[in-house]
Amino acid sequence: AGNMGGSIARGLAKGSLIDDSDIIVSNPSAGKLEKLKKEFPGISITNSNVEAATGADIVILAVKPWFMEPVMRELKLKSKQILISVAAGISFEELAHYVVAPEMAMFRLIPNTAISELESMTLVAARNTNDEQDKFILRLFSEMGTVMLIPEDKIAAATALTSCGIAYVLKYVQAAMQAGIEMGLRPKDAMQMIAQSLKGAAALIQNNDTHPSVEIDKVTTPGGITIKGINELEHNGFTSAIIKAMKASK
C-alpha cells in the first residue's frame, strides 16, 4: 500500500474483474492501510505479508528491489500461485532463485505513476504462464490504462519510454508553463492549455495511427510561427536531448 502498491490496489478495487472482498493489502504502515480501507471498506488489510499471501491466487509484490529477496523468501509461495513483481530491475532468473517453486507462473509488471489516474502505460512480461493467465492479467491491468505484453529483454528500453518517459513529458510541461508565465499567462491557465494540448497530440497519433511527423507537417506552414519554434528547438538540441535521456535511463 505504498505509492505504487496503493495505486494498484485502488485500481483493482475500482475495476470490475475482482471483488473488493477478494483483495487483501499488506503494509507496515497502519496509517496507509487505514486510509485505503476508508476508501474501499470491502478490502482486507494487514501488516503481515505472509497473511496476505497465504491462500491467494495472485500475489502482487510492489516493494523496492532491495526488499524482494527477503520478502519472497519469507512468503514461500506455492507453484499454483501466480506471482506479479512490480520491482524494477529484478529479472525472472532472480525471482526464480527467491521462490520455493521456480516453475510457478510469473509476471513482471512495469506501470507508470499515471496508474493512480487509471491512465498508466503498463508493460507486462511473462514466464511459465499459459494463454489464459496472460489474457486475464492483461485484462486486469487494462482497467488501469493501456497494457502491452513484451519480451523480458525489451523491458529496460520500454521502461525508459514509459516509466521514465512520463517524467520527461512532465518536464516539458513544466518548461512550457514557465514560458507561458513569462509571456503573461496565469500558471493555472498555462498548465491547462499545455495538458490539453498533450492530450490532443496523443489522440491525433493514436486515433489516426499516424506518425508524429505527419501531424507536425499539418501545423508547420511555410514562414509560420510553428516552424520557427521547431527550428529553435532543434538549434538547441531538443531531439538529441530526448534520445540521450531515454538511452541514459535504460
Residue ranges with predicted function:
Residues S44-E51, M148-I150:
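Short acidic-hydrophobic, aromatic-tinged amphipathic segments that line or gate anion-handling sites
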Residues I24, A30, F40, N49-V124:
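Rossmann-like NAD(P)(H) cofactor-binding subdomain of soluble oxidoreductases
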Residues I23, L33, A52, M68, ...:
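Small-residue helix-packing motif on alpha-helices
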Residues M106-F107, I155-A160, P212-D217:
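Short pre-catalytic strand/loop immediately N-terminal to key active-site residues, enriched for Gly-Thr
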Residues E94-A105, M121-A158, V169-N207:
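Internal alpha-helical scaffold of NAD(P)-dependent oxidoreductase catalytic cores
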Residues A1-N47, G55, E119, I181-M183:
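NAD(P)+-binding Rossmann beta1-loop-alpha1 motif at the extreme N-terminus of oxidoreductases
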Residues A195-K250:
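NAD(P)-dependent Rossmann-like dehydrogenase/reductase catalytic/cofactor-binding core
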Residues I8, L12, L33-L36, V71-L75, ...:
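Hydrophobic packing residues within well-ordered alpha-helices of enzyme cores
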